């Protein structure tokens, strides 16, 4: 059987997604000198904020770097919220990141971090409005790098759209992916892939050691990945108990 050949301009009734051209911002600082922001498509926001529209929402919420996880919640219907409701850190690892800052592994967690609901949203809006505005705000805050997570399959696509916008603004990024094929197809600049289910990208809930290790290795790969589009497996496994 011959290999599949793709011919430019050939039309087909079968939709074949096209991976967008690579975007890439090189890392120019050591991790110990970086202020790092968290960005998630998993629907995380402050309890005091307006909930996301579960049918589709391209807005985003700012989460302060000093906010308590007890004051956060999730509005998202596209993935099982069981783990993240036990521990926000398994999708939005803000406590592990604060620990890494305290230990000097990174300079600081950014004063603003971002949550949005990537499932069912308008992809054009994410590309033309949400992503560029998130990038602008992070740039204004002097963010040096961004660590992302995503929930469902559509979330992973939306997260990469935002990731690419941040990267295009001059900030290097890396996403912790539960669905590596989705982020690859959508043109992730950099990604890591622990063996985790959707809804616990940063590791098992209430397992700060695993979460810290995943964040640590993700940030190391931010520096070590040599070119756009590479996805590095991480040696951590969590199987959700359902």
From Swiss-Prot:
Localization of this protein: Cytoplasm
Active-site residue numbers: 152
Pfam family membership, one: GRDB
GO cellular component: cytoplasm
Main location: cytoplasm
EC identifiers of the protein: 1.21.4.1
Catalytic activity: [PrdC protein]-Se-L-selenocysteinyl-S-L-cysteine + 5-aminopentanoate = [PrdC protein]-L-selenocysteine/L-cysteine + D-proline
Post-translational modification: This subunit is carbonylated in vitro on an unidentified residue.
NCBIfam families the UniProt entry points to: D_pro_red_PrdB, various_sel_PB
Misc note: The reaction mechanism first involves the formation of an adduct (and not a Schiff base) between the nitrogen of proline and the pyruvoyl group of the alpha subunit. The selenol anion of selenocysteine in PrdB nucleophilically attacks the alpha-carbon, resulting in cleavage of the N-C bond of the proline ring. This intermediate is then transformed to the oxidized gamma subunit containing a mixed selenide/sulfide group and to the 5-aminovalerate adduct of the alpha subunit. The final product, 5-aminovalerate, is formed by hydrolysis.
Function: D-proline reductase catalyzes the reductive cleavage of a C-N bond in D-proline resulting in the formation of 5-aminovalerate. The alpha subunit has been shown to bind D-proline, presumably via the pyruvoyl group.
Assembly, per entry: Consists of 3 subunits of 23, 26 and 45 kDa (alpha, gamma and beta respectively). The molecular weight of the complex is approximately 870 kDa, suggesting a decameric structure, if all 3 subunits are present in equal stoichiometry.
Listed name of the protein: D-proline reductase subunit gamma
């Amino acid at each position: 059987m011959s290999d599949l050949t793709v011919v430019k301009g050939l039309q087909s009734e079968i939709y074949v997604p096209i991976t967008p051209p690579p975007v890439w911002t090189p890392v120019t600082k050591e991790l110990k000198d970086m202020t790092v922001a968290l960005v998630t498509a998993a629907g995380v926001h402050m309890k005091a904020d307006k909930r996301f529209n579960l049918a589709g929402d391209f807005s985003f919420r700012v989460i302060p770097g000093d906010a308590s996880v007890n004051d956060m919640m999730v509005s998202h219907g596209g993935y099982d919220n069981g783990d993240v409701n036990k521990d926000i850190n398994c999708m939005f690892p803000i406590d592990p990141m604060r620990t890494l800052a305290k230990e000097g592994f990174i300079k600081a967690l950014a004063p603003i971090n971002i949550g949005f609901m990537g499932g069912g949203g308008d992809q054009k809006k994410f590309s033309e409005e949400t992503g560029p505005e998130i990038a602008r705000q992070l740039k204004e805050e002097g963010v040096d790098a961004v660590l992302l997570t995503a929930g469902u399959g559509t979330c992973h696509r939306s997260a990469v759209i935002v990731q690419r916008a941040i990267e295009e603004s001059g900030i290097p990024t890396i996403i912790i992916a539960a669905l590596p094929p989705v982020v690859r197809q959508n043109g992730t600049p950099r990604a890591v892939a622990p063996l985790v289910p959707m809804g616990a990208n940063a590791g098992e809930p209430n397992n700060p050691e695993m979460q810290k290790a995943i964040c640590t290795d993700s940030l190391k790969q931010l520096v070590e990945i040599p070119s756009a589009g590479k996805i590095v497996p991480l040696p951590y496994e969590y199987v959700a108990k359902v």
